[in-house]
């Protein structure tokens, strides 16, 4: 009899409580879990949830799609947000669609978008 067969025979003689203690001891010693594997049907749902979490963006670009009817107000807001001069801000607004701010946090992007929308602009977050 090989050592593996002997070990299997000895484990087979353990009570349920002893077997449970053995599993816990092995989990601790080797840093593993004896949790059952997920069945095939459950695996399809799990990666979809993980993919959605992984795809959640942390940085956004604020894009000015159109200036709208109140172009002067939009130019003022673009100047305040970007720090551009009057001429550069006017060129940006006239050349819409243009990216006003790149790689900003979600909160900041929403704040900028609200300011631009309040001024009459059409805005998109990418």
Swiss-Prot record:
The entry's keywords: Ribonucleoprotein, Ribosomal protein
A molecular-function term among this protein's GO annotations: mRNA binding
SUPFAM superfamilies in the cross-refs: ClpS-like, Ribosomal protein L7/12, oligomerisation (N-terminal) domain
A GO cellular-component term linked to this record: cytosolic large ribosomal subunit
Keyword flag Cytoplasm: no
Biological processes, Gene Ontology terms: translation
Function, as annotated: Forms part of the ribosomal stalk which helps the ribosome interact with GTP-bound translation factors. Is thus essential for accurate translation.
Descriptive protein name: Large ribosomal subunit protein bL12
Organism of this sequence: Chlorobaculum parvum (strain DSM 263 / NCIMB 8327)
Annotated gene: rplL
